[in-house]
From Swiss-Prot:
Predominant location: cytoplasm
CDD domains: URO-D
Species this protein is from: Dechloromonas aromatica (strain RCB)
Binding of substrate, residues: 27-31, 77, 154, 209, 328
Name of the featured protein: Uroporphyrinogen decarboxylase
Alphabetical keyword list: Cytoplasm, Decarboxylase, Lyase, Porphyrin biosynthesis
Phylogenetic lineage: Bacteria, Pseudomonadati, Pseudomonadota, Betaproteobacteria, Rhodocyclales
Gene responsible for this protein: hemE
Assigned protein family: Belongs to the uroporphyrinogen decarboxylase family.
Free-text function comment from the UniProt entry: Catalyzes the decarboxylation of four acetate groups of uroporphyrinogen-III to yield coproporphyrinogen-III.
Catalytic reaction equation(s): uroporphyrinogen III + 4 H(+) = coproporphyrinogen III + 4 CO2
Subunit details: Homodimer.
InterPro entries: UROD/MetE-like_sf, Uroporphyrinogen_deCO2ase_HemE, Uroporphyrinogen_deCOase
Enzyme class per UniProt: lyase
GO cellular component: cytosol
């Protein structure tokens, strides 16, 4: 299978020359877009939207119809994996995701098994295939999963948390139980991402949203080593084309060199680290993705453009190795016109800097 017509994103991840800096946004298909809100309304609820391949395809494509983005990302949710493992995902109105059966008991943890992505997550694979057909080889499609530790946070807490006291208590009191959860989840994520690749994903990303809440030693033991295992288990090629991998730990700047050493092709950065400093620290080992503060998009368009240029200038002179993104997901309250200003600024300024 040939590369997409616009393969700038893939080339940047593989540190091949590009004519400009490619750009996509975490949560680019989301509630800041009125068309997304309309589709979600038709779906009835968020889970219905995720589990309908046709609707997931529709919302995946919406930001690409509006903006000149360089990649599409599968519309789904990181919690589909623990849901497939039998924890009973549901969304309480106004309260976010919850699990009916959080993992607190030893017997339940010992009964966990690796999920078969085709048996339990077939709707995701159907969505990937449908999106690839709809994209018609225009831009690459990114598949994704949460990291084992981030998924375990929800699996043990049963919902989002401000202090993660249940999983932290397990980490210190019964690290063996947490390692059991992480091991089964890591193997499930490997199978899940490889199934996405087989279904058409052309790059994959691991979102480690909560790894940055760990202590230095705990991060390496309970988050990083499992992401290393996943990266090692990923399919590196499909139909003769390299499948790059991106790893993103929010608040992970402390461990940048260690993340770059696990075998991934690119490291995602949040907005708390200077991307130029990050580049100096990792050298040419990996590409970098990021890292504009998402809240910049609440500023005036000319400020958005100026802040985007600061990120590009900080990365420094190069014709490859940088994928522009936000430092975290785009806010649902973002004015859509701010994204227009951002895309135009990134593409135009990066083209000029290569002349």
């Amino acid at each position: 299978m040939s590369r997409p017509k616009n393969d700038t994103f893939l080339r940047a991840l593989l540190k091949e020359p590009t004519e400009y800096t490619p750009l996509w946004l975490m949560r680019q298909a989301g509630r800041y877009l009125p068309e997304y809100c309309e589709t979600r309304k038709r779906a009835g609820n968020f889970l219905n939207l995720c589990k309908s391949p046709t609707m997931a395809c529709e919302v995946t494509l919406q930001p690409l119809a509006r903006y000149d983005l360089d990649a599409a990302i599968l519309f789904s949710d990181i919690l589909t994996v623990p849901d497939a493992m039998g924890l009973g995902l549901y969304f309480a109105e106004g309260e976010g995701p919850k699990f009916e059966r959080p993992l607190r008991e030893e017997w339940a943890i010992n009964n966990l098994t690796v999920t078969d992505p085709y048996e339990h997550l077939g709707y995701v694979m159907d969505a990937v295939s449908e999106i690839r057909r709809a994209l018609d080889n225009s831009v690459p499609l990114i598949g994704f999963s949460g990291s084992p530790y981030t998924l375990a946070c929800y699996m043990v807490e049963g919902e989002g948390s401000s202090d993660f006291r249940n999983i932290k208590a397990m980490l210190y009191n019964r690290p063996d139980l947490l390692h059991r959860i992480l091991s089964v989840t890591a193997d499930s994520v490997i199978a899940y991402l490889n199934a996405q690749i087989d279904s058409g994903a052309q790059a994959v990303m691991i979102f480690d949203t909560w790894g940055g809440s760990l202590s230095n030693a705990a991060y390496e033991e309970f988050s990083l080593q499992y992401m290393r295992r996943i990266v090692a288990g990923l399919k590196k090629e499909k139909d003769g084309q390299r499948i790059p991998s991106i790893v993103f730990t929010k608040n992970g700047g402390l461990w940048l060199e260690k993340i770059a050493d696990i075998g991934c092709d690119a490291v995602g950065l949040d907005w708390t680290i200077d991307i130029g400093e990050a580049r100096r620290r990792v050298g040419d080992k990996v590409a970098l993705q990021g890292n504009l503060d998402p809240n910049v998009l609440f500023a005036q368009p000319e400020i958005v453009a100026a802040e985007a240029k600061k990120v590009l200038d900080s990365f420094g002179p190069a014709n490859t190795g940088h994928v522009f993104n936000l430092g975290h997901g785009i806010s649902q309250f973002t004015p859509p016109e701010s994204v227009t200003a951002l895309v135009e600024a990134v593409h135009s300024h990066s083209r000029l800097s290569r002349k």
